[in-house]
Amino acid sequence: HFGSFVYKKNNKNKKMIRIFITCFIALSLGVNAHADIKGSTLNKISEKVSSTVSNLIPGEGLTEVDISIRDDNEGNPEVQFDILGVRDLIDNENSNVFTQFSLHSQDVNGDKRAIGNIGLGYRELNADQSMMIGGNIFYDVDLFEQHQRLSMGLEARAAIIDFNYNYYQEISNNQIVDGFNEKVLSGQEYNLSSQLPYMPWTTFNIQGYRFENEKAAQDTKGNIYSLEMALTPSLAFDVENDVSSVDGQDDMWNYRLTFTHPPRTNKATLMDGLTSDVAFVKANMQDKLKDKVRRNNNLVVEIQGAVTITKK
């Protein structure tokens, strides 16, 4: 038992070391890209793409297009595309009622799916505008196979740190797809995020998640560590590592480019400089009223057969 404990501990330490090395490499790439960004080459390209993005969804508000690559460390990368919009319904200086919606691709058991999400949210600032609290509800659906899910979320966000919690509840029956029984799982997650010290153009996020399996021996659980980097007002690059707590489950890596419209002129980017004189730059809380909700738009699906696996 002691030997097993030591092995698991060493394995966990190796995972953490790899996470820090990857974040260091990502930041180093940011340093190397800084000269190019200052020369405005990347900025001009991202602004051009951003203006094109603005035409995809009508109305005023945040519009994002993501291109991401998921790597399972076994040479099976998955490319996913996502378009997301946030639109105000009733807003003023201290509160906001809004809708958020997205359409994206997801690979489930080698099969490309189209996943739709639509939600309604409410956010409010406290009296001195130092904190924002909010709640939201979402409906998620696999447009091809009719898997369905509801979620409820809570947010508490301050000038230098954000927290949110999401609970997901499946509402559809099992579906037979290509001879396999598929089941959407219920579960929950939390997110805690803040900027790296003296780098206001970065955000480091820790997510803990757990989804209740139906037939698999263990629930799907783990932690996701992500580094989000705002390169220009219109372009961000994210690196995340999904560290599973399930025995025998490999880590997943995700690399994402996000084009945003309108450009985030009120948020620090790498264009403003690699470092700041202030350790933590306080964010404008009114701007956070119009941010997207941080949640998992992918469905977590258990594929039941001779061997039961889970895709998320």
Pin down the residues of each PLM region:
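Flexible, glycine-rich linker and terminal segments associated
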Residues: 35-58, 171-205, 211-217, 230-238, ...
